[in-house]
């Protein structure tokens, strides 16, 4: 019910507790999401202030959060903050680089649009295997 109709407000997430978040299907991510929501609700993690950071500083700050690695930080940069130059690398992108680009990372050539290109290539690789 917490996520049934819309994205919940930070204060609702932070007060929900682990059980409610587990029921949303977050699995092992539950405590990380809860902790980040609590930090945001308390003001120690200012999500709006993050938006004003340059790409690399935003990425670095996200990497400081518990449970956040390179892929998740890049996903948040790309999808949450519209930083279209960020390229999340998961198993599908690793396979794509290996199979279609002989192990050479193709994304630097796309510059500030690399994240958009990544999405097209991600869906391509997922559909053809």
Where do the PLM segments sit?
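HhH-family (HhH-GPD) DNA N-glycosylase catalytic core used in base-excision repair
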Residues: 1-129
């Amino acid at each position: 019910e917490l996520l049934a109709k819309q994205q919940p407000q930070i204060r609702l997430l932070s007060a929900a507790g682990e059980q409610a978040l587990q029921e949303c299907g977050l699995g092992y991510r539950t405590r990380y999401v809860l902790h980040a929501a609590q930090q945001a609700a308390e003001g120690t993690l200012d999500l709006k202030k993050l938006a004003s950071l340059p790409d690399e500083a935003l990425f670095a700050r996200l990497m400081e959060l518990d449970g956040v690695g390179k892929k998740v930080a890049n996903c948040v940069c790309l999808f949450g903050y519209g930083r279209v130059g960020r390229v999340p690398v998961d198993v599908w992108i690793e396979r794509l680089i290996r199979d279609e680009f002989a192990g050479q990372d193709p994304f630097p050539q796309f510059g500030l649009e690399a994240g958009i290109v990544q999405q097209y290539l991600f869906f391509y690789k997922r559909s053809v295997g």
